[in-house]
UniProtKB/Swiss-Prot annotation:
Binding site for substrate: N224, M253, Y282, H318, S338, R339, G340, D379, G380, L381, R382, E418, Y445
Species annotation: Sphingopyxis alaskensis (strain DSM 13593 / LMG 18877 / RB2256)
Gene: thiC
Region named Disordered: 1-22, 97-120
Cofactor(s) the record lists: [4Fe-4S] cluster
This protein's name: Phosphomethylpyrimidine synthase
GO cellular component, one term: cytosol
Length: 630
């Protein structure tokens, strides 16, 4: 455990640390790009028992240096700047003085910072910005035919280092996607140029490991973290970020709304190997004391620049909540449930004006392309109950998001589209179809959707069902839901449950889409299960710790790890053990010609007796006199 300075959490007897070290049964590896460029991509290999004769299973890894035993983790220093040289080598950025941090950035902390958290010790004095007239977005490079190191990294990462993915099992229904057998850097470039994929990669977040979000790539997941006005602890937030990426979160959104927003975000960004997203309107609202009506374009613009200079990779912008759409939500069961959507709806009604986000959208886009920040166009009118699913308000906003997508693409800025929400199973595909139509195949990023409203405490399951379905239909990234959804802020355990549930949904979607090699891990686990390789079963699972814990609740002895049964059926009724015995028996019969002949004769005799049974009217034990014997 690498401890964060104890000053970050004065309420704890011992300082909170971040989890480090390899995931059980796995090792960190670095795979060289096949182009010979020197780019090395981090992955994870799950090691199997030597006696099995099976090779390691390679899996996508989001955990960054935290699972590398050779890495030195110092939270106060931050992570190595993987992309720094790539960014500067392009020659289109300049250094500028970072905007001065103000009290309102941290929730009106005074000059003495009382009630605040320590500032990150190594805050940059200079930050990067595009040179005047330049555009530093990955989409801009892609449309000029340039394959960036980020695109090359993504290609190697998506292939998991395999040279011939088509050799693996591929079976599924892709609903019109264009998933290749093998991902090349040119394929990545083309997908980004078309707007069908994004690589969130702010030039001021060089610590991030490039990843792609798009329907023709592996389905990704996002984890939300963040403090609130009633719960703020930067150490816990950094730990939740590290914990969530350990279990598979591809991106993390910092949704902080309380005090210390700026400083908390700095700690997270400097220690995050995955893209970080935010909802800037939350911080802007804090700057006006929580009064939505007092928001202005100038305050919002300043907040965007503040976060852009820190390195936020994508912004949720609720520019689709327009004044004419607000009355459409009035007849809903649950009205407007999006925080950002409700803030903008209130502002529109108070001023009886069009949203300043919509009016100034092109100016926002100018900021985005100067730092390579991707849009995550917010669904402020998403349904908050299945009764409101697929209604007029939801789809009116969706078509506006399509219009805004085209405006952003006109300036070569990357875009993904946020989606619902609460949608019953039979209405899910309509959401995907309309999004593809309205938004030109821009990546879809959905919260679930939750398929029923009756399970508070289990909404990671109600939403996991919808997430697997919509991921199969084409959603590129799934925003996790934890068991605490609708009930409270998730803690560390809730974050893990949410992430693992959504990794399951994303993987199920990859299988259903027929993604090359998606089934390799499933087949390896199935084989380990049939061969009673218990440790391999644990290690191949999404959550090895919980799998072994459940096994050990009834069979904790070390010998049980090699036993040919579990506590479900016991040694005499294990179906797989019996199947193995049947296999061995059949194998022996086939090897022994006399035994094979005897088996054939026995089968012939059984067929004859079966016919007698049919001929006698299916009566049992018929005697010579035609009477049934007792």
């Amino acid at each position: 455990m690498a401890d964060i300075d104890s000053r970050l959490d004065t309420t704890q007897a011992t300082p909170i640390g971040v989890t480090t070290g390899p995931i059980r049964g796995s090792r960190k590896i670095h795979v060289a790009s096949p182009t010979g460029s020197g780019i090395r991509v981090a992955m994870r290999e799950i090691l199997l028992e030597p006696s099995s004769g099976e090779p390691p299973v390679r899996v996508y890894d989001t955990s960054g240096p935290y699972t590398d035993p050779d890495a030195t983790i110092d939270i106060a220093q931050g992570l190595p700047e993987l992309r720094a040289s790539w960014i500067r080598a392009r020659g289109d950025v300049e250094e500028v003085a970072q905007r001065e941090v103000r009290p309102e950035d941290n929730g009106q902390l005074g000059p003495d910072r009382s009630g605040g958290v320590p500032a990150f010790p190594n805050v940059r004095k200079k930050v990067l910005r595009a040179k005047p007239g330049a555009n530093v977005s990955q989409m801009h490079y892609a449309r000029r035919g340039i394959i960036t190191p980020e695109m090359e990294y993504v290609a190697t990462r998506e292939n998991l280092g395999r040279e011939r993915l088509a050799e693996y099992v591929r079976d599924g229904q892709d609903w019109g996607a264009s998933i290749p057998d093998y991902v090349t850097p040119e394929f990545v470039r083309d997908e980004v140029a078309r707007g069908r994929a994004i690589i969130p990669s702010n030039i001021n977040h060089p610590e991030s490991e490039p990843m792609a979000i798009g329907r023709n790539f592996l389905v990704k997941i996002n984890a939300n973290i963040g403090n609130s006005a009633v719960a703020s602890d930067v150490a816990a937030e950094v730990d939740k970020m590290v914990w969530s990426i350990r279990w598979g979160a591809d991106t993390v959104m910092d949704l902080s709304t309380g005090r210390n927003i700026h400083d908390t975000r700095e700690w997270i960004l400097r220690n995050s190997p995955v893209p970080i997203g935010t909802v800037p309107i939350y911080q802007a609202l804090e700057k006006v004391g929580g009064i939505a009506e007092e928001l202005t374009w100038e305050i919002f613009r300043d907040t965007l620049i503040e976060q852009a200079e820190q390195g936020v990779d994508y912004f949720t912008i609720h520019a689709g909540v327009r004044l004419p759409y607000v009355p459409l939500a009035a007849k809903r069961v649950t009205g407007i449930v999006s925080r950002g959507g409700s803030i903008m709806a209130k502002w529109c009604l108070a001023h009886h004006r069009e949203s300043f986000l919509y009016d100034h959208f092109d100016e926002i886009t100018e900021i985005m392309k100067a730092y390579d920040i991707a849009y995550s166009l917010g669904d402020g009118l998403r349904p908050g109950s299945i009764a409101d699913a697929n209604d007029e308000a939801q789809f009116a906003e969706l078509y506006t998001l399509g219009e805004l997508t085209r405006r952003a693409w006109a300036q070569d800025v990357q875009v993904m589209i946020e989606g619902p929400g609460h949608v019953p199973m039979h209405k899910i595909k309509e959401n995907m179809d309309k999004q593809l139509e309205a938004c030109g195949e821009a990546p879809f990023y959905t919260l679930g959707p939750l398929t029923t409203d009756i399970a508070p405490g289990y909404d990671h399951i109600t939403s996991g069902i919808g997430a697997a379905m919509i991921g199969w239909y084409g959603t590129a990234m799934l925003c996790y839901v934890t068991p605490k959804e609708h009930l409270g802020l998730p803690d560390r355990d809730d974050v893990k449950v949410g992430v693992v549930t959504y990794k399951l949904a994303a993987h199920a979607a990859d299988l259903a889409k027929g993604h090359p090699a998606a089934q390799v891990r499933d087949d390896a686990l199935s084989k380990a299960r049939f061969e009673f390789r218990w440790r391999d079963q644990f290690n191949l699972s999404l959550d090895p710790d919980t799998a072994e814990q459940y096994h050990d609740q009834t069979l904790p002895a070390e010998g049980a790890k090699t036993a040919h049964f579990c506590s479900m059926c016991g040694p005499k009724f294990c179906s797989m053990k019996i199947s193995q015995e049947v296999r061995e028996f059949a194998k022996l019969q086939n090897q022994d010609s006399a035994g094979f002949i005897a088996a054939e004769e026995a089968e012939k005799g059984m067929a004859e007796m079966s016919q007698v049974y049919e001929d006698t009217g299916r009566e049992l034990y018929m005697g010579a006199g035609g009477r049934e014997h007792d």
